[in-house]
């Protein structure tokens, strides 16, 4: 019979052999190394980065304080789940309000953030809601309760912005000629976006059927700056 000390001394090598066998056969969970994590497709990383930069609360308060002609707008964006969707796209609910009237959003939409078909950019596709008012304040709810039913969406995307990484920022525009619209007297809308870590600049503009600008940024873009992560 082996003593307890002899048994322990034999068990130690045995443990090492068993551990090595488990590792070699894949029975122990493998943790991706930093190098493996960084090996993700560039567009996948970019989609996640665009989502991170869009999510949270941004305002134009600083701009409005320096120029009384500028509106003080709050933009709130949060992740949501589109029921039944199995794609790799990430969905965001976004609403805009005047900072002095937070309970009455004047713009609400769903954004679908995904890699472009050619894998060279990130696309942000915007959807209108059939009934938007009941969704006001959605971002204040727990993530598990932020569910959007497909039937809540009013058809296909109203517009898509293609975002391309340029250094430490993302830049994008609407398609040439803009997108059809019926928002506040505009027959079409255009937008130019620069997305930073600390916020974004946007030249969101609406034009009537004769090509006259009826609302939106003119000489200077709206400068949204992050209020919360």
From Swiss-Prot:
Q: What class of enzyme is it?
A: lyase
| A molecular function (GO) term | lyase activity
What is the protein name for this chain?
A: Chromophore lyase CpcT/CpeT 1
InterPro entries per the UniProt record, alphabetical: CpcT/CpeT, CpcT/CpeT_sf
Keywords assigned: Lyase
Family that this chain belongs to: Belongs to the CpcT/CpeT biliprotein lyase family.
Q: Which CDD domains match?
A: CpcT
Record flagged with keyword Lyase: yes
Q: What does this protein do?
A: Covalently attaches a chromophore to Cys residue(s) of phycobiliproteins.
Q: Which HAMAP family match?
A: Chrphore_lyase_CpxT (MF_01460)
Q: Which organism is it from?
A: Gloeobacter violaceus (strain ATCC 29082 / PCC 7421)
One Pfam family name from the record?
Answer: CpeT
Q: What is its EC number?
A: 4.-.-.-
């Amino acid at each position: 019979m082996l003593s307890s000390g002899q048994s322990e001394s034999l068990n130690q090598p045995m443990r090492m052999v068993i551990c090595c066998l488990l590792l070699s056969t894949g029975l122990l969970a493998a943790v991706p190394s930093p190098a493996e994590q960084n090996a993700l497709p560039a567009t996948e990383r970019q989609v996640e980065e665009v989502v991170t930069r869009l999510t949270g609360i941004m305002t134009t308060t600083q701009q409005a304080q320096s120029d009384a002609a500028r509106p003080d707008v709050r933009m709130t964006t949060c992740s949501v789940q589109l029921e039944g969707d199995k794609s790799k796209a990430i969905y965001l609910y976004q609403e805009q309000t005047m900072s002095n009237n937070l309970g009455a959003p004047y713009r609400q939409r769903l954004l679908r953030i995904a890699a472009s078909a050619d894998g060279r950019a990130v696309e942000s596709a915007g959807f209108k809601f059939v009934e938007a008012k009941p969704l006001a304040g959605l971002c204040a709810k727990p993530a598990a309760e932020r569910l959007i039913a497909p039937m809540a969406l009013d058809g296909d995307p109203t517009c898509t912005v293609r975002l391309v990484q340029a250094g430490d920022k993302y830049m994008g525009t609407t398609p040439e000629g803009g997108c059809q619209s019926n928002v506040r007297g505009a027959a079409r809308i255009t937008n130019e976006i620069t997305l930073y870590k600390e916020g974004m600049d946007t030249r969101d503009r609406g034009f009537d059927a004769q090509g006259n600008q009826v609302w939106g940024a003119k000489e200077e873009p709206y400068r949204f700056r992050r209020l919360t992560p």
